[in-house]
Amino acid sequence: MPFPLASQGSQQSQKTYGITSPISLATPKDTDCTLTQKLIETLKPYGVFEEEDELQHRILSLGKLNNLVKEWIREISELKNLPQSVIENVGGKIFTFGSYRLGVHTKGADIDALCVAPRHVDRSDLFSSFYEKLKQQEEVKDLRSVEEAFVPVIKLCFDGIEIDILFARLALQTIPEDLDLRDDSLLKNLDIRCIRSLNGCRVTDEILHLVPNIDSFRLTLRAIKLWAKRHNIYSNILGFLGGVSWAMLVARTCQLYPNAIASTLVHKFFLVFSKWEWPNPVLLKQPEECNLNLPVWDPRVNPSDRYHLMPIITPAYPQQNSTYNVSVSTRAVMVEEFKQGLAITDEILLLKAEWSKLFDAPNFFQKYKYVFYNLLAMFAWGEIINKNKKRCYTLKKKKK
């Protein structure tokens, strides 16, 4: 697996990425390359890099799934009596998004996938005939559908790989192989569930188009994701940041230091976001107007958007804040972690510490000793409430 140990050349400095000029156009020194190699060696034991044979297995499995989709769409087209000329070129395609599409998935990670179909294929077709087709495949295990979810999904294990499949029906007669989902015009005449399903691919692809050096971005993101997980701040549900938010912060760092490599970018990440003046938003590009009347993040128009504490705005239309769950307390925790990360990477760059120090897991009970007792109190109080509920219910039954 190739890793970036040097800049891509002076041409990178000719283009401005993001909404501001770069902070620095400095190119890597020998020490930066050495530190980047040490970073790679430090990351390896944590399983953040997949072996080549595992990667090829994923590619092969996705290819099989893609062929199944094409075959299924042809069958649906025949059942709906489309002309033979259309059936022969009807297409259909599986796109990936999330960590796999970004190129930062870890060993054994699942794959987020999107099934894109032409206009005559309904979502109900996916959850009926395609679901039945999947059932018949010997590679498919643990098949289940969640049709009524906020974003409807089919979950399965395909040849040992866990895959989540979303669905989007485009207003096109056929789906070409070279379809670019970043094209905003594809959103016209789509229902909201299709737009939500498309959003993951559109955001992921846009991020990759907005960084100056994809290899440096990927290695930096692997390091930051591992650091966030080790420090227990990788969770959108708990009010911290999820995968796409971390990716956008790393992408913004890459835009500000377009010629830097991973060892420098990890340090600059902590430098930038330990000093960021929240709630100023993090933007990878200026929001675009598409006149499709979809709700977008805009504090000038939407009063509720003004109360977001740590806005990180997705770069694809319709732009959304990916961190709406962040609270005052979780933001304070993250900012403190950024400051500690900066202090450690300062030491690493001065050759006074090793990369392993950055990924040392903090002692939870030393750091949050009072939270433990509060949780015990909450559990105890919950038991009292549950017992009282049962008692009240029993009394009501007796009275009857």
Swiss-Prot record:
<keyword id="KW-0694">RNA-binding</keyword>
<feature type="binding site">
    <location>
        <position position="164"/>
    </location>
    <ligand>
        <name>Mg(2+) 2</name>
    </ligand>
</feature>
<feature type="binding site">
    <location>
        <begin position="110"/>
        <end position="112"/>
    </location>
    <ligand>
        <name>ATP</name>
    </ligand>
</feature>
<feature type="binding site">
    <location>
        <position position="110"/>
    </location>
    <ligand>
        <name>Mg(2+) 2</name>
    </ligand>
</feature>
<protein>
    <recommendedName>
        <fullName>Poly(A) polymerase type 3</fullName>
        <ecNumber>2.7.7.19</ecNumber>
    </recommendedName>
</protein>
<dbReference type="GO" id="GO:1990817">
    <property type="term" value="F:poly(A) RNA polymerase activity"/>
</dbReference>
<keyword id="KW-0479">Metal-binding</keyword>
<keyword id="KW-0464">Manganese</keyword>
<dbReference type="Pfam" id="PF20750">
    <property type="entry name" value="PAP_NTPase"/>
</dbReference>
<keyword id="KW-0460">Magnesium</keyword>
<dbReference type="GO" id="GO:0005524">
    <property type="term" value="F:ATP binding"/>
</dbReference>
<feature type="binding site">
    <location>
        <begin position="97"/>
        <end position="99"/>
    </location>
    <ligand>
        <name>ATP</name>
    </ligand>
</feature>
<feature type="binding site">
    <location>
        <position position="112"/>
    </location>
    <ligand>
        <name>Mg(2+) 1</name>
    </ligand>
</feature>
<feature type="binding site">
    <location>
        <position position="225"/>
    </location>
    <ligand>
        <name>ATP</name>
    </ligand>
</feature>
<dbReference type="GO" id="GO:0006397">
    <property type="term" value="P:mRNA processing"/>
</dbReference>
<keyword id="KW-0808">Transferase</keyword>
<comment type="subunit">
    <text>Monomer.</text>
</comment>
<comment type="function">
    <text>Polymerase that creates the 3'-poly(A) tail of mRNA's. May acquire specificity through interaction with a cleavage and polyadenylation factor (CPSF).</text>
</comment>
<feature type="short sequence motif" description="Nuclear localization signal">
    <location>
        <begin position="382"/>
        <end position="390"/>
    </location>
</feature>
<dbReference type="Pfam" id="PF04928">
    <property type="entry name" value="PAP_central"/>
</dbReference>
<comment type="similarity">
    <text>Belongs to the poly(A) polymerase family.</text>
</comment>
<dbReference type="InterPro" id="IPR007012">
    <property type="entry name" value="PolA_pol_cen_dom"/>
</dbReference>
<feature type="binding site">
    <location>
        <position position="110"/>
    </location>
    <ligand>
        <name>Mg(2+) 1</name>
    </ligand>
</feature>
<dbReference type="GO" id="GO:0046872">
    <property type="term" value="F:metal ion binding"/>
</dbReference>
<feature type="binding site">
    <location>
        <position position="164"/>
    </location>
    <ligand>
        <name>ATP</name>
    </ligand>
</feature>
<feature type="binding site">
    <location>
        <position position="112"/>
    </location>
    <ligand>
        <name>Mg(2+) 2</name>
    </ligand>
</feature>
<dbReference type="InterPro" id="IPR014492">
    <property type="entry name" value="PolyA_polymerase"/>
</dbReference>
<keyword id="KW-0547">Nucleotide-binding</keyword>
<feature type="binding site">
    <location>
        <position position="234"/>
    </location>
    <ligand>
        <name>ATP</name>
    </ligand>
</feature>
<dbReference type="InterPro" id="IPR043519">
    <property type="entry name" value="NT_sf"/>
</dbReference>
<keyword id="KW-0067">ATP-binding</keyword>
<dbReference type="InterPro" id="IPR048840">
    <property type="entry name" value="PolA_pol_NTPase"/>
</dbReference>
<keyword id="KW-0507">mRNA processing</keyword>
<dbReference type="GO" id="GO:0003723">
    <property type="term" value="F:RNA binding"/>
</dbReference>
<feature type="binding site">
    <location>
        <begin position="243"/>
        <end position="244"/>
    </location>
    <ligand>
        <name>ATP</name>
    </ligand>
</feature>
<dbReference type="GO" id="GO:0005634">
    <property type="term" value="C:nucleus"/>
</dbReference>
<keyword id="KW-0539">Nucleus</keyword>
<feature type="binding site">
    <location>
        <position position="106"/>
    </location>
    <ligand>
        <name>ATP</name>
    </ligand>
</feature>
